[in-house]
Each structure stands twice: as C-alpha cells, then as structure tokens.
Amino acid sequence: MSQRIEGLFLRATKIKHNSIIVDLLTRQYGRSTFVFTISTKKNQAFLFQPFHFIEFSAAYTPEKKVNRANNVEMKFPIIDILSDIRKTGYALLLTEILNKVFHTEEKNEKLFVELEKMIISFEHRPFNAVF
C-alpha cells in the first residue's frame, strides 16, 4: 500500500538517464534508499540537493534494501541556501557528514524534527559562520 513519506536528502546516484537512487533520512523509517524515475520535462532532478526536504509516495517494504518511489515534491523551498555560496558550502559539508553518520535504518523522529528546525533556521537567518 502506497503512503506519503517525508525525507531529508543525503546522497544520489544516477543509474539511467531517467532513474536515480537516493539515500534519505526519513521521518518514518530512518535512513532508507529509494529509486525515483525522474521526468526531464518537470526538472525533478532539482529536488535532490543538499538540505532539501522532500515528500513522496512509496510502498515501503522493510525487507527490501531499495524501494521504488514516485510523486516527489519539495516539502518547503530552500532558496537562500542555494543562492548564497557560503551557505551552499555548509550545506554540502553537513550533508556529507550526515551521510557518513547515519548507517542504520532506525527511526528517530526527534532527530528528524530537530534537523528540520535547524535547516529552516539556517535558511531564514543571515549567514553566520557559527550558526
């Protein structure tokens, strides 16, 4: 049964001209891997960037290492982080660190909510090296 899942982008690997494997930190399941079929007409590849929170539909099966997903949407826009090169650098660094830190598929909703708050705060505040 398909359900809506929220996730924070960690890493992506393009496998075909229209498919991409994405590692996400999800609110419901912890770190998970999904395959998305992306449409070049809709420019969906833009959604898979550091600090992007996305929401999508998937029939999640814990036994599978990779699940298929579709109907991807950005949860909230991240504009200032992408337009400020200093913030973009921090986003790339922190996304890489998060990718290395989260190995297990354990659900940790508190951590997900705190990361979400931190990223929203980073988006809306002026750049400060010690945010």
Where in the sequence are the language-model features?
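Non-catalytic alpha-helical scaffolds and adjoining flexible linkers that form interface surfaces
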Residues: 1-131
